[in-house]
C-alpha cells in the first residue's frame, strides 16, 4: 500500500479520534473521518504491545493492510480510517481477520456495496 494511503502523524490520528465516528466488534475498533478534499481513503493502524511481540503485531498490520488493498475498490473514498486491533486478533488467521474487518466495515457503512 502506497505511503499516501497511510496515516502516520500523531496529529492526524488525534484528529480522527476526536472528530470521527467509531464502530467496533470484538476484534477491531474503526474510527472514520470524512475528508471531502481528499480523493482517496487513508488508513492508520494501532496494534498494542499487549497483543504480542513485534512479529505478531507486524503480522496483524500486514493482514489489515492486505484486506484494505484487496477491498480498495469497495471502500468509501474521501475518508480517513483508523483501525485498532483488539486482543483476539493475535490468534486469528488472515481469512478470519478479513471476515471480521469486513463485518465492522459493513456495520460502519464504509463499504460502497454489500460484500460477502
Curated annotation (Swiss-Prot):
The record's annotation in SUPFAM superfamilies points to: Ribosomal protein S5 domain 2-like (SSF54211)
If you read the UniProt record, what top EC class would you report for this enzyme, in one word? Answer: hydrolase
What is this protein's name?
Ribonuclease P protein component
Q: What EC designation does it have?
A: 3.1.26.5
Instruction: Specify whether tRNA processing is a keyword of the entry.
Output: yes
The reaction(s) annotated as catalysed by this protein in its Swiss-Prot or TrEMBL entry are:
Endonucleolytic cleavage of RNA, removing 5'-extranucleotides from tRNA precursor
What are the protein's UniProt keywords? Endonuclease, Hydrolase, Nuclease, RNA-binding, tRNA processing
| Protein family | Belongs to the RnpA family.
Q: Which organism is it from?
A: Geobacillus sp. (strain WCH70)
Name the PANTHER family on file. Answer: RIBONUCLEASE P PROTEIN COMPONENT (PTHR33992:SF1)
Gene Ontology cellular component? ribonuclease P complex
| One function term, GO molecular function aspect | ribonuclease P activity
Q: How does it assemble?
A: Consists of a catalytic RNA component (M1 or rnpB) and a protein subunit.
| GO BP annotations listed | tRNA 5'-leader removal
Ranges annotated as spanning the membrane? none
Q: Which InterPro entries does the entry link to?
A: Ribosomal_Su5_D2-typ_SF, Ribsml_uS5_D2-typ_fold_subgr, RNase_P, RNase_P_CS
> What does this protein do, in the record's words?
RNaseP catalyzes the removal of the 5'-leader sequence from pre-tRNA to produce the mature 5'-terminus. It can also cleave other RNA substrates such as 4.5S RNA. The protein component plays an auxiliary but essential role in vivo by binding to the 5'-leader sequence and broadening the substrate specificity of the ribozyme.
